[in-house]
Amino acid sequence: ACPGPNPGRP
């Protein structure tokens, strides 16, 4: 999960 504006991304 990536932090920031796209937490839903791996």
UniProtKB/Swiss-Prot annotation:
One of its GO terms (biological process) is regulation of blood pressure. This is Angiotensin-converting enzyme inhibitory peptide. Keywords: Hypotensive agent, Nematocyst, Secreted. It is found in: Secreted; Nematocyst. One of its GO terms (cellular component) is extracellular region. Belongs to the bradykinin-potentiating peptide family. It comes from Chiropsoides quadrigatus. Inhibits the angiotensin-converting enzyme (ACE) (IC(50)=2.03 uM). May act as an indirect hypotensive agent. In vivo, is not toxic and does not induce lesions and microscopic abnormalitie in rat liver. The keyword Secreted applies. Its main location: secreted.
